[in-house]
Amino acid sequence: MNKLSSSAITTTWLAMIIIVLDQVTKYWANTSLTMGEPVAILPHLNLTLVYNYGAAFSFLSEVGGWQRWFFTALALVVGTALVIWLAKLPKRWTLEVVAINLVLSGAIGNVIDRILAGRVTDFVDFYIGSWHYATFNVADMGISIGAVLLIISEFWLKPRHEKKAHSTEESV
């Protein structure tokens, strides 16, 4: 059997679903919302169309345009590394595989925006009182949730599994 078909790379359909959801919701936001005007959805949650020309929390958003290509290149490098990582994992659903797919989908979703529009469309606005968290999108949710799951997988679950495997080897 082909090495790629027996690897977790075949799970990238999860990333594709998130990418499509991200792009559809961004299209909806761009065609249905008015820039900067919040639409109340729930207490503490608005939909507010904003454009991010930088990175997370609008980091480097006002430095002249070079950041578009810098963050595009960075996301492509990270995305390539994630695909290689998936290709080396066995074909089965683990927390690590789900996490990598979520981060990959978020990176690709935001790269599509940067390439096509030179900016990322954000529209989910969470707030408490007058404090507003950075406005975000579905791709950002994928990156954030995937990163948390990857940390849990790599630093809590894998070490436990490795300790258990090591203690089993010692008892033999």
From Swiss-Prot:
UniProt KW ATP-binding keyword: no
Keywords annotated in UniProt: Aspartyl protease, Cell inner membrane, Cell membrane, Hydrolase, Membrane, Protease, Transmembrane, Transmembrane helix
Record-annotated membrane-spanning stretches: 4-24, 39-59, 69-89, 93-113, 136-156
EC number(s) stated in the UniProt entry for this protein: 3.4.23.36
Pathway: Protein modification; lipoprotein biosynthesis (signal peptide cleavage)
Any one GO BP annotation for this protein: proteolysis
Pfam families: Peptidase_A8
The reaction(s) this protein catalyses: Release of signal peptides from bacterial membrane prolipoproteins. Hydrolyzes -Xaa-Yaa-Zaa-|-(S,diacylglyceryl)Cys-, in which Xaa is hydrophobic (preferably Leu), and Yaa (Ala or Ser) and Zaa (Gly or Ala) have small, neutral side chains
Segment forming the signal sequence: none
GO molecular function: aspartic-type endopeptidase activity
Root EC class: hydrolase
NCBIfam families assigned to the protein according to its UniProt record, in alphabetical order: lspA
Function: This protein specifically catalyzes the removal of signal peptides from prolipoproteins.
HAMAP family documented for this protein: LspA (MF_00161)
Protein name per its UniProtKB record: Lipoprotein signal peptidase
Originating species: Hydrogenovibrio crunogenus (strain DSM 25203 / XCL-2) (Thiomicrospira crunogena)
Recorded name of the encoding gene: lspA
